[in-house]
């Protein structure tokens, strides 16, 4: 699933081609993704794209006729091409075409993403309920420690909760907990202030590094220029079940926590008794 670094990579990849451009047409080939594609999108001819931004895993196109919320879902990706350069494929569900002939193409084999119109993205219910951005100054050790009090949930599920902090998906949660030397099943309420300092620090480091690497390609995700994300080449625990830990040589284990596969080193990430 594309996570925060993949969406940030997509934003940076498409922004130079779309910022300031006028929408000629939005072609919708599939009316139902995770939710129904907003009808308003097909009536945005002449709208100017005045800015692009990201909130959590949502890419937002701010236009003179409202905002477009895009989510990549489980398997989505965005590509930039010239109009009439390449016929749409089976999984190419939406094309945003600009007056100068650029095409933003949305591909999603599993059809679990979304394209929604809203008057103001900041006031949309999908956005207003979100926690702080992990790379922002508001995501601090003091904040995380305060939110963790009386939380019996596993720390891995805790940091993946978008009400607590956005964009820390499964891959980056596993990697961050490894770097912080925290077992994924440790109860959030048992985190110390020092552990929260370390965890916040490594979450920021892991996500920043992943963005530099263009995200993580495990199956479907590709960057707008067609290249894969290279962070997969430096994963320490995620997807490495039965392989040796790079730090201590202990065999990496996997366990389902919160309905997701979790990867950890039982030696580097010991669960306190």
UniProtKB/Swiss-Prot annotation:
Chain positions of all zinc fingers (FPG-type): 236-270
Keyword hit for Cytoplasm: no
Catalysed reactions, semicolon-separated: Hydrolysis of DNA containing ring-opened 7-methylguanine residues, releasing 2,6-diamino-4-hydroxy-5-(N-methyl)formamidopyrimidine; 2'-deoxyribonucleotide-(2'-deoxyribose 5'-phosphate)-2'-deoxyribonucleotide-DNA = a 3'-end 2'-deoxyribonucleotide-(2,3-dehydro-2,3-deoxyribose 5'-phosphate)-DNA + a 5'-end 5'-phospho-2'-deoxyribonucleoside-DNA + H(+)
Domain of life: Bacteria
Xref: Gene3D superfamilies: 1.10.8.50, MutM-like, N-terminal
E.C. number: 3.2.2.23, 4.2.99.18
Organism of derivation: Actinobacillus pleuropneumoniae serotype 5b (strain L20)
Active site residues per record: 2-3, 57, 260
Gene (name only): mutM
Name used for this protein in its record: Formamidopyrimidine-DNA glycosylase
Key words of the record: DNA damage, DNA repair, DNA-binding, Glycosidase, Hydrolase, Lyase, Metal-binding, Multifunctional enzyme, Zinc, Zinc-finger
Cited HAMAP family: Fapy_DNA_glycosyl
Role: Involved in base excision repair of DNA damaged by oxidation or by mutagenic agents. Acts as a DNA glycosylase that recognizes and removes damaged bases. Has a preference for oxidized purines, such as 7,8-dihydro-8-oxoguanine (8-oxoG). Has AP (apurinic/apyrimidinic) lyase activity and introduces nicks in the DNA strand. Cleaves the DNA backbone by beta-delta elimination to generate a single-strand break at the site of the removed base with both 3'- and 5'-phosphates.
Known partners and oligomeric status: Monomer.
Cofactor requirement: Zn(2+)
Gene Ontology MF terms in the entry: 8-oxo-7,8-dihydroguanine DNA N-glycosylase activity; class I DNA-(apurinic or apyrimidinic site) endonuclease activity; damaged DNA binding; zinc ion binding
Co-factor note (free text): Binds 1 zinc ion per subunit.
């Amino acid at each position: 699933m594309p996570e925060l670094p993949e969406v940030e990579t997509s934003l940076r990849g498409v922004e130079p081609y779309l910022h300031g451009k006028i929408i000629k047409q939005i072609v919708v080939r599939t009316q139902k993704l995770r939710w129904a594609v907003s009808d308003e999108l097909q009536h945005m001819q002449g709208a100017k794209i005045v800015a692009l931004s990201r909130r959590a895993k949502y890419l937002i196109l701010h236009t003179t006729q409202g905002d477009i919320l895009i989510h990549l879902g489980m398997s989505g990706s965005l590509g930039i091409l010239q109009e009439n350069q390449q016929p749409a494929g089976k999984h190419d569900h939406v094309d945003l075409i600009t007056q100068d002939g650029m095409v933003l193409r949305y591909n999603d084999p599993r059809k679990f993403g979304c394209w929604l119109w809203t008057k103001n993205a900041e006031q949309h219910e999908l956005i207003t309920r979100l926690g702080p951005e992990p790379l922002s100054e508001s995501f601090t050790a003091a904040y995380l420690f305060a939110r963790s009090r009386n939380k019996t949930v596993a720390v891995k599920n805790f940091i993946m909760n978008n009400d607590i902090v956005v964009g820390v998906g499964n891959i980056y949660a596993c990697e961050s907990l490894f770097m912080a030397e925290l077992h994924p099943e440790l109860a959030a309420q048992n985190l110390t202030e020092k552990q929260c300092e370390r965890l916040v620090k490594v979450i920021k480091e892991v996500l920043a590094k992943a963005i530099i690497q263009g995200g993580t390609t495990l199956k479907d995700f590709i960057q707008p220029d067609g290249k894969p994300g290279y962070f997969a080449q430096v994963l320490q625990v995620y997807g490495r079940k039965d392989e040796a830990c790079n730090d201590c040589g202990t065999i990496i284990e996997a366990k389902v926590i919160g309905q997701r596969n979790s990867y950890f080193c039982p030696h580097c990430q010991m669960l306190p008794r």
